[in-house]
Amino acid sequence: MNWTVDIPIDQLPSLPPLPTDLRTRLDAALAKPAAQQPTWPADQALAMRTVLESVPPVTVPSEIVRLQEQLAQVAKGEAFLLQGGDCAETFMDNTEPHIRGNVRALLQMAVVLTYGASMPVVKVARIAGQYAKPRSADIDALGLRSYRGDMINGFAPDAAAREHDPSRLVRAYANASAAMNLVRALTSSGLASLHLVHDWNREFVRTSPAGARYEALATEIDRGLRFMSACGVADRNLQTAEIYASHEALVLDYERAMLRLSDGDDGEPQLFDLSAHTVWIGERTRQIDGAHIAFAQVIANPVGVKLGPNMTPELAVEYVERLDPHNKPGRLTLVSRMGNHKVRDLLPPIVEKVQATGHQVIWQCDPMHGNTHESSTGFKTRHFDRIVDEVQGFFEVHRALGTHPGGIHVEITGENVTECLGGAQDISETDLAGRYETACDPRLNTQQSLELAFLVAEMLRD
């Protein structure tokens, strides 16, 4: 398989050689044990990596540097981080309506949070690369190889479709590039207009069963916008927005193929993972001596690490020391995913231990993954109340310790799916079958996402 030109793989342009020290560090990282990797032929994977090494990147270093600057504000308590999007992107749903819907949902949430926090909101989407998922078992209930995301195999319950296919690496890149191109176009051509986004939010308040609760906040935002209009404020920032791309750095054949060399802030050559602006290491692949953490050490992108209920304060400190050796504010985001019943007990000693190191990390709450259960009707689901409660517990911990609750990381969609229970729509277990469309884990629908944003805005104002 080739990219878009009829050139044999062995004639594609090669990347310039890395400086010796970077080459040594990268090789050492990739030689470590790597969990959750596809089992495909090494020679075919090498051929696909060669293709990806010759293509234009999905992002560019200057955008990553700009994101790093904004994340430094979050780490210092001067901004808030909103990260959200599909649990797993699919090639089939990589369409203009779906991407537009997700971008719109993220923008709607961001407007509410910006007003509630009275500070900038850094917007990061789970988009343009979230095509792979770790799984708890290699074989599913049908006796087939588990679906691991479109980057690795197909979703259809068919043995041939479930084979691990390295040519999907190139398909993932093509879809990611197209998605990122559309995101840039949408956010610079009117969709991100503050007045338009607020009008959508007013519609939510008008039609939602819980709208009355949020009417006061929406009216305040409305008054603020009218005041700016009366003053003749017509700044470009009111018409556009920056949305950065993120995904879990899971499939190392993909991540390593998208590495590019560029000069850093200090003029020294650095390796940027240009498959995204920022990546995170998941709960199942964050082995302290594994390849994923070592890979994250090598790249210049800001990175995140998921912290589940088994995390210890001592291990959290070790992640901080390895991934943020130069104490760069916002370089590292620690994403707690404890579950609503555990966050109030487990998070405080971790925060205290990390804060004592003097590192300025971002504390972010993932209220989704610790609150997943199977419904009586057989669907994997999450209850809206538990999601809200984990965010509330996260805020309570940080308020008590005097630290900054820096952000939330949520799985959302701009479509009216029925995957998570509860919320103002009061989705029940019998409703789940109506529009249960996720390729992996359940997502908050548009109304639930915006309802969560209004509730978090209230927390930010308290």
Swiss-Prot record:
The keyword Disulfide bond does not apply. GO terms for biological process: amino acid biosynthetic process; aromatic amino acid family biosynthetic process; chorismate biosynthetic process; protein homooligomerization. Phosphoenolpyruvate binds at R126, E283, R284, K306, R337. It catalyses: D-erythrose 4-phosphate + phosphoenolpyruvate + H2O = 7-phospho-2-dehydro-3-deoxy-D-arabino-heptonate + phosphate. GO terms for cellular component: cytosol; peptidoglycan-based cell wall; plasma membrane. Pathway: Metabolic intermediate biosynthesis; chorismate biosynthesis; chorismate from D-erythrose 4-phosphate and phosphoenolpyruvate: step 1/7. Its EC number is 2.5.1.54. Coiled coil: none annotated. Pfam families: DAHP_synth_2. Keywords: Amino-acid biosynthesis, Aromatic amino acid biosynthesis, Cadmium, Cobalt, Manganese, Metal-binding, Transferase. Mn(2+) binds at C87, H369, E411, D441. SUPFAM superfamilies: Aldolase (SSF51569). Its cofactor is Mn(2+); Co(2+); Cd(2+). Homodimer. Interacts with Rv0948c. Catalyzes an aldol-like condensation reaction between phosphoenolpyruvate (PEP) and D-erythrose 4-phosphate (E4P) to generate 3-deoxy-D-arabino-heptulosonate 7-phosphate (DAH7P) and inorganic phosphate. This is Phospho-2-dehydro-3-deoxyheptonate aldolase AroG. The lineage of its organism: Bacteria, Bacillati, Actinomycetota, Actinomycetes, Mycobacteriales.
